[in-house]
């Protein structure tokens, strides 16, 4: 696209807080400033394809089903929450601030940026896996209110907090281990939040999920153990549980 229609130009003028320009070589629209097209009943970006937006990009609370045409890079935050997205394909790959894709119908995080400067929020979706998550999140990672059964695919680094409340977690395999312990949120899962935090603390101390969970068998409820037991090999359950009584894994 080397030219824009009058409707596209009017739309860009209304939504851009700053200067927008069309690169005739790439056909991409760059914005020096913020772009806000939130809450306008949009199903897409009117055929416009964005390149770099130096400020924030708001397209939340619309009816958008695809991020095709979304910015390739956002210097500030990117908000696409409250839409009808089932995929993050087309999402910006560089985001300096927050990335919020909550309240959609996502079943996968494939296509998400691999580095997010501040917070990443994918709450209130239909995720069963975290595969595709950013590798690095500067502050908080929120994946609460989904359908996760484990944390496989979670970021390798999270600067502050990790919220996985109200999922279907029976395992912490894949958990990000460099977050602040007091900001690891895990209530509302089949395994009690207290038990998950205790397991997570041992994992942060260098133990695998299997060893950490098995060592706490005598300290958790029968209900929690019922969900965790299938993850623990039968051969190691008695020995690890006994050694746990003597504080070997403290």
Where are these regions (language model features)?
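LRR N-terminal entry segment and analogous cap-like coil->beta motifs
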Residues: 14-80, 95-97, 101, 117-118, ...
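Canonical leucine-rich repeat
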Residues: 31, 45-48, 59, 67-70, ...
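Serine/proline-rich low-complexity intrinsically disordered segments, especially terminal tails, linkers
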Residues: 68, 79-80, 86-89, 101, ...
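N-terminal capping/linker segments that flank leucine-rich repeat
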Residues: 1-49, 196-250
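Leucine-rich repeat domain C-terminal region
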Residues: 164, 177-213
């Amino acid at each position: 696209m080397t030219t824009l229609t009058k409707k596209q130009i009017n739309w860009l003028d209304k939504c851009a807080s700053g200067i927008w320009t069309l690169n005739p070589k790439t056909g991409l629209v760059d914005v020096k400033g913020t772009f806000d097209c939130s809450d306008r009943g949009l199903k897409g970006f009117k055929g416009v394809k964005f390149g770099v937006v130096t400020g924030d990009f708001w397209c939340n609370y619309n009816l958008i089903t695809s991020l095709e045409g979304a910015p390739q890079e956002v210097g500030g935050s990117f908000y696409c929450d409250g839409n009808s997205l089932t995929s993050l394909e087309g999402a910006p790959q560089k985001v300096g601030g927050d990335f919020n894709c909550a309240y959609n119908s996502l079943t996968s995080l494939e296509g998400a940026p691999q580095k997010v400067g501040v917070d990443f929020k994918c709450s209130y979706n239909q995720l069963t896996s975290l595969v595709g998550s950013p590798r690095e999140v500067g502050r908080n990672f929120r994946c609460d209110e989904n359908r996760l059964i484990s944390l496989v695919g979670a970021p390798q680094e999270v600067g502050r907090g990790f919220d996985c409340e109200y999922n279907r977690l029976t395992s912490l395999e894949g958990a990000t281990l460099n977050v602040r312990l007091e900001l690891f949120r895990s209530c509302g899962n089949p395994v009690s939040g207290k038990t998950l935090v205790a397991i997570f603390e041992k994992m942060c101390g260098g133990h695998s999920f299997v060893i950490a969970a098995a060592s706490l068998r005598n300290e958790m409820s029968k209900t929690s153990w019922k969900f965790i037991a299938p993850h623990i090999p039968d051969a190691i359950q008695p020995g690890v549980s006994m050694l746990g009584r003597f504080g070997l894994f403290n």
